[in-house]
Amino acid sequence: MIVVTGGAGFIGANLVKALNARGREDVLVVDDLSDGTKFVNLADCTLGDYLDKDDFLARVKAELRGEPSELPPIEAIFHEGACSDTTEWDGKFMLENNFEYSKVLLHFCQYKRIPFLYASSAATYGGSEVFVEAPEHEKPLNVYGYSKLLFDQYVRVHWESFDAQVVGFRYFNVYGPREQHKGKMASVAYHHHSQVKRGENPKLFGAWDGYEAGMQSRDFVYVGDVVDVNLWCLDHPEVSGIFNLGTGRAEPFKAIAETVIDYYATGKIDYIDFPEELKGRYQSYTRADISRLREAGYKAEFKTVREGVSAYLDWLNG
């Protein structure tokens, strides 16, 4: 079986759907469905099994102790499960979910000598102006970013002891299908779609941090492209490392709003004051340096904002 933790979530559910498209139905999804609305992300997928994240962790720990675990044979783990709320400041909760849990799965994969492909984050860079996978550029602005950095550091420290593939993906701003459950943490593209559907105008932050209104820029990457990179790495077990996963381009938030307005042929951008609570904790600019990913052999192109958002809107209206 292939395990996808966070498999009912945004990137995880897209991975499950893509594995199904490859003919893989032996997928074990691990998640927490306390928020039952997430089931819709898996409603059109085929699963081999489902386990609650706490039950799965207990079985993994039992296996590591040499005890009976009732786990099926596992050939790879995609570890997408995490608390991804950048406004969450409970550090104990964040480290339990994003650091301690990840450590156990990492050691399990090494024990079984199977691939471990996990979600890191561009939040590890925080206030940096350079987005290269190196410690001198890692300056997280929130405890979420720190929890992801802490695990990346753990991986680096133990790197020489690994016998099986380990790949960390520093996701930049991912958007696309199956993210509706994320609420306020869903992408700007999703929020702009929702605003227009309610008869409102798309809203963006006004001028701030030296940027004109709507011109704060991020590396926006379509979830389908993210899934393609994950699966490419699974297909290339010789590839290991921590890689930025973005497009290599920075595009302004305004480009998303304009794409949504053009798609629906209605509305204009409303600019709002930059929130006080985000000042000093907000990345006004990101652009993934994807040199390391390219050097590893990944050649496929990434969608532009206009291409990706248009495809996303087609899906939302399908």
From Swiss-Prot:
UniProt-listed PANTHER family: ADP-L-GLYCERO-D-MANNO-HEPTOSE-6-EPIMERASE (PTHR43103:SF3), NUCLEOSIDE-DIPHOSPHATE-SUGAR EPIMERASE (PTHR43103)
Q: What class of enzyme is it?
A: isomerase
Which protein, by its recorded name, is this? Answer: ADP-L-glycero-D-manno-heptose-6-epimerase
The UniProt similarity line reads:
Belongs to the NAD(P)-dependent epimerase/dehydratase family. HldD subfamily.
Cofactor(s) essential for the protein? NADP(+)
- Residue ranges the record marks as coiled coil: none
Q: Which reaction does it catalyse?
A: ADP-D-glycero-beta-D-manno-heptose = ADP-L-glycero-beta-D-manno-heptose
Q: How is the cofactor bound?
A: Binds 1 NADP(+) per subunit.
Q: Does the keyword Isomerase apply?
A: yes
Q: In which pathway does it act?
A: Nucleotide-sugar biosynthesis; ADP-L-glycero-beta-D-manno-heptose biosynthesis; ADP-L-glycero-beta-D-manno-heptose from D-glycero-beta-D-manno-heptose 7-phosphate: step 4/4
Q: To which species is this protein native?
A: Chromohalobacter salexigens (strain ATCC BAA-138 / DSM 3043 / CIP 106854 / NCIMB 13768 / 1H11)
How does the record describe its quaternary structure? Homopentamer.
The record's section on CDD domains has: ADP_GME_SDR_e
Q: Which GO terms describe its molecular function?
A: ADP-glyceromanno-heptose 6-epimerase activity; NADP binding
Catalytic site positions: 144, 182
Q: Where does NADP(+) bind?
A: 10-11, 31-32, 38, 53, 80-84, 97, 148, 174, 182
**Which processes are annotated in GO (biological process)?**
ADP-L-glycero-beta-D-manno-heptose biosynthetic process; carbohydrate metabolic process
Isomerase recorded as keyword: yes
Q: Which UniProt keywords apply?
A: Carbohydrate metabolism, Isomerase, NADP
InterPro entries (UniProt xref): Epimerase_deHydtase (IPR001509), Heptose_epim (IPR011912), NAD(P)-bd_dom_sf (IPR036291)
Question: Which parts of the sequence bind substrate?
Answer: 173, 184, 191, 205-208, 218, 282
Pfam families, per database record: Epimerase
